Amino acid sequence: MGTELNKVYCMDNLELLKQMDDNSVDLIYCDILYNTGRKFKDYDDNLGTPQQAMEWYRPRLIEMRRILKDTGSIYLQCDYRLIHYLKIEMDNIFKVENFINEIIWKYGLGGSGKKSFSKKHDNILFYSKSKDYIFNIQYEDATSNKLKGCKKKMIDVWDIANINNMAKERIGYDTQKPKELLRRIIKASSNKNDVIADFFVGSGTSLVVAKELGRDYIGCDINQRAVDITNKRLEEVGK
């Protein structure tokens, strides 16, 4: 690779992507900027209009496709603000025939709407680079009383609790995602010693889970605090 494995870079992700070799990554997961217009403690989530946001994402998505192996997959997490625009971009760049799933993550926590149904889910777009992609079927506990104690194939709606403020897993970074969410993705779309990449690393959950599951990784965030938190969490894996 044109970059080191098992390292977290503090830089513009487009610049890092341009340095990476073709066909060098097995799985990409990115919890992208949702374009909420909010300024969080750790980052500014404002890319302008949805169209301006897509102009910003497009060169990055093109590079992500280039570095992905033919057997690789990409998961992009967003919400209602960008999902429709992002789906069109991904259909154009990764091709409609390589769309696999739109996963709904139902998380439960959050505010309630006064003049709307409460918004309690994120969208995760799952695309492959080709039809020869890695996929390990995942199972979950059956909910029917008749099938109690049995397993069933996982569906595309994932009911996983978000991390509450008192949870041991919470590390104090805005929009931190739960490990269970990343375990499902990484187990399904990679094998041991594969390379996992995250170019919006944030709290570092994706890389921590990758390391716990015996995968190599490469991460990037433009925020130094995100990189520092991620490196600290990675150092604690296995201790």
Where do the PLM segments sit?
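Core catalytic lobe of class I
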Residues: M1-K239
